[in-house]
């Protein structure tokens, strides 16, 4: 009989790896394409990410001169981690992408109404990764329709729950 490996049965993506979610992006945008990118971070930022002191809500991605940048992401520094430097919590951070991925982003953003937004920040093999999405902004009526659909799903779940019991 062969021994079963320790990794058997474990899922690759666990909830413990997620640092931050941008839930507002799902409400404000239709996400059409998703990409994974690395982040160029400083030491104090990595420590703050381990403590989950990050906010993606007001951030966006800008492609300038063939490079992708994360703008508006707030990483609050730990008081013990940054004693000899003056950290900037909202500094512009470089995203690490392949050239073809950057070209795809440039082509997507050139279309009218499209933008690139960060969706999720997580750990992968000890490295901080960010999931970005090519998205199109929702109009007010789209947001209302989504809200209505969510309410109906909740109500349906409640009805089914009471019906089964």
Curated annotation (Swiss-Prot):
Domain of life: Bacteria
UniProt biased composition (Basic and acidic residues): 143-158
Keywords carried by this UniProt record: Cytoplasm, RNA-binding
Residue ranges of the region described as Disordered: 135-165
Function: Required for rescue of stalled ribosomes mediated by trans-translation. Binds to transfer-messenger RNA (tmRNA), required for stable association of tmRNA with ribosomes. tmRNA and SmpB together mimic tRNA shape, replacing the anticodon stem-loop with SmpB. tmRNA is encoded by the ssrA gene; the 2 termini fold to resemble tRNA(Ala) and it encodes a 'tag peptide', a short internal open reading frame. During trans-translation Ala-aminoacylated tmRNA acts like a tRNA, entering the A-site of stalled ribosomes, displacing the stalled mRNA.
Cellular component terms per the entry's GO annotation: cytosol
CDD domains xref list: SmpB (cd09294)
GO molecular function: RNA binding
SUPFAM superfamilies noted in UniProt: Small protein B (SmpB) (SSF74982)
Subcellular location: Cytoplasm
NCBIfam families listed in its UniProt record: PRK05422.1 (NF003843), smpB (TIGR00086)
Name of the protein: SsrA-binding protein
Classification via PANTHER family: SSRA-BINDING PROTEIN, TMRNA-BINDING COMPONENT OF TRANS-TRANSLATION TAGGING COMPLEX
Source species of the chain: Halorhodospira halophila (strain DSM 244 / SL1)
Pfam families assigned: SmpB
Keyword Ribosomal protein (UniProt): no
Annotated family: Belongs to the SmpB family.
HAMAP family cross-referenced by the UniProt entry: SmpB
A Gene Ontology biological process term: trans-translation
